[in-house]
């Protein structure tokens, strides 16, 4: 009997008080998580780890989450955090498999959205 590895998710959030609990919550829901605090670190993580999906805060202290979003491979599911919906609306329209989650957000809803997006992406690859 073989078991598949948990889906690898890139979490880009510069606020430790948000990033750490979200990372733990995702791990509790059977995701493997790679974290990054800056846009540069996130872009490096994309190339190094090839995540199956990403959760990205648009407003980072160092760099722009927007740069991370456009660096994700086409077809990779991306959830964008934003307190300002107009910031991410353009990215959501331009990039397939991108969804906006407005702050504040429900962790349960976030995980369900992530699972649905990953499942949909896997189905479209076959």
Mark where each language-model region is.
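Non-catalytic signal-transmission and effector/linker regions of two-component phosphorelay proteins
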Residues: 1-10, 106-126
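Conserved acidic carboxylate
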Residues: 13
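Acidic phosphotransfer microenvironment of two-component signaling modules
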Residues: 16, 37-41, 108
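Two-component/phosphorelay signaling modules centered on CheY-like receiver
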Residues: 16-34
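Acidic, metal-coordinating helix/loop segments flanking the phosphotransfer/catalytic sites
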Residues: 35-53
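Conserved phosphotransfer microenvironments
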Residues: 57-72, 85
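Hydrophobic/aromatic residues positioned on beta-strands within the core alpha/beta folds
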Residues: 81-82
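A Lys-centered signature of the CheY-like receiver
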Residues: 103
């Amino acid at each position: 009997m073989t078991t598949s590895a948990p889906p690898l998710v890139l979490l880009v959030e510069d606020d430790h008080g948000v990033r750490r609990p979200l990372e733990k919550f995702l791990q509790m829901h059977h995701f493997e998580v790679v974290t990054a605090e800056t846009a540069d670190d996130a872009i490096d993580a994309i190339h190094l780890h090839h995540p199956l999906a990403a959760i990205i805060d648009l407003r980072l202290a160092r760099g722009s989450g927007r740069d991370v979003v456009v660096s994700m491979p086409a077809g990779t599911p991306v959830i964008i955090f934003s307190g300002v919906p107009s910031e991410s609306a353009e990215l959501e329209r331009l990039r397939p498999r991108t969804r906006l989650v407005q702050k504040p957000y429900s962790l349960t809803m976030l995980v369900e959205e992530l699972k649905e997006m990953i499942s949909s992406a896997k189905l479209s690859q076959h």
